């Protein structure tokens, strides 16, 4: 499903089986592309007359719902369905919803989780965290990811190539102490930052000394990661207007990657307002 030429099931692959079993751990966040892969599996199996069995898994973020709804004009691999960033469903529930609302007609079967309650998070499972990918090494990473993944659409490092991906944010032009003080002054619930200097071993700014912050979760029950991510973008553009930038368009239609992540094009407007944007998210 992650080959270079296509992310869909090919005719040749579909001809190899009668039933496809989907057994993939997710992180409860729309950017994490396993959910788009699930949509493709539903659509491709429906078109080919194949059965799809989803082994349901609990959502590590529980019933957390946050962020705006993806607009139809920015549907992409990081936003493959019109839903919020944190969606509060299990993969089985999401599969049923997509199959129904997209009118796929897939022969879909869900093997449910035993003993699951809606409010459960990973803390309630009684298991060790198993990395769903190298970028999400800890549960704490999954908690921050809905907010700090927005940094992937900018010229700042989101911490890839460090020991704390999505927990360390920075760039060569950032003065760590001043930026940390300004971030903490925002009063993001459940969070505190400390200044950090780091040199990424991979991805953006590889081999270059960066200043920035490391995020520490003090109270995950009041955490608002998407709101934190929006305020982080706003702080970066205000403190470093000459250096901070969104990455250039990645598609022929001119849409920037940040718009695909966010699920809307508001960030492309020079006068976007963080408070107004977060108020709209809450309404949606």
Which sequence ranges carry the predicted segments?
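Glycine-rich oxoanion-binding loops at beta->alpha junctions
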Residues: 1-16, 29
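Short acidic catalytic loops
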Residues: 19-27, 53-56
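Glycine/threonine-rich flexible loop motifs
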Residues: 26-38
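A short helix->loop->beta-strand "cap" motif at the edges of active sites that frequently abuts
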Residues: 45-51
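Glycine-rich, charge-decorated loop segments at or immediately adjacent to ligand/cofactor-binding or catalytic sites
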Residues: 53-75
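Conserved anion/nucleotide-ligand pocket segment
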Residues: 75-148
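Glycine-rich, aromatic-lined ligand/substrate-binding cores of catalytic
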Residues: 116-196, 200
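Conserved functional hotspot residues or short segments at active or partner-binding sites
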Residues: 170-281
């Amino acid at each position: 499903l992650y080959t270079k030429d296509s992310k869909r099931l090919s005719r040749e692959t579909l001809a190899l089986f009668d039933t496809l079993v989907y057994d993939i751990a997710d992180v409860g966040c729309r950017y994490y592309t396993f959910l788009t892969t699930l949509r493709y599996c539903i659509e491709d199996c429906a078109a080919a007359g194949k059965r799809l069995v989803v082994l349901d898994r609990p959502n590590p973020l529980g019933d957390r719902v946050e962020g705006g709804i993806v607009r139809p004009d920015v549907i992409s691999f990081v936003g493959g369905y019109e839903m919020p960033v944190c969606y509060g469903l299990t993969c089985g529930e999401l599969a049923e919803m997509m199959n129904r609302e997209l009118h796929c007609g897939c022969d879909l079967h869900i093997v449910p989780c035993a003993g699951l309650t809606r409010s459960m998070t990973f803390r309630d499972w009684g298991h060790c965290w198993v990395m769903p990918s190298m970028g999400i090494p800890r549960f704490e990473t999954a908690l921050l990811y809905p907010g700090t993944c927005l940094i992937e659409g900018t010229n700042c490092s989101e911490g890839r190539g460090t020991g704390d991906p999505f927990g360390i944010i920075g760039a060569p032009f950032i003065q760590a102490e001043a930026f940390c003080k300004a971030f903490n002054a925002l009063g993001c619930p459940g969070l505190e930052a400390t200044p950090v200097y780091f040199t990424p071993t991979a991805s953006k700014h590889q081999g270059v000394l960066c200043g920035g912050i490391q995020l520490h979760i003090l109270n995950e029950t009041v955490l608002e990661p998407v709101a934190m991510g929006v305020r982080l973008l706003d702080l970066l553009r205000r403190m470093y207007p000459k250096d901070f930038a969104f990455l250039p368009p990645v598609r022929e239609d001119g849409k920037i990657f940040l718009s695909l992540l966010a699920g809307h094009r508001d960030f492309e407007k020079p006068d976007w307002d963080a408070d107004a944007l977060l108020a709209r998210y809450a309404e949606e």
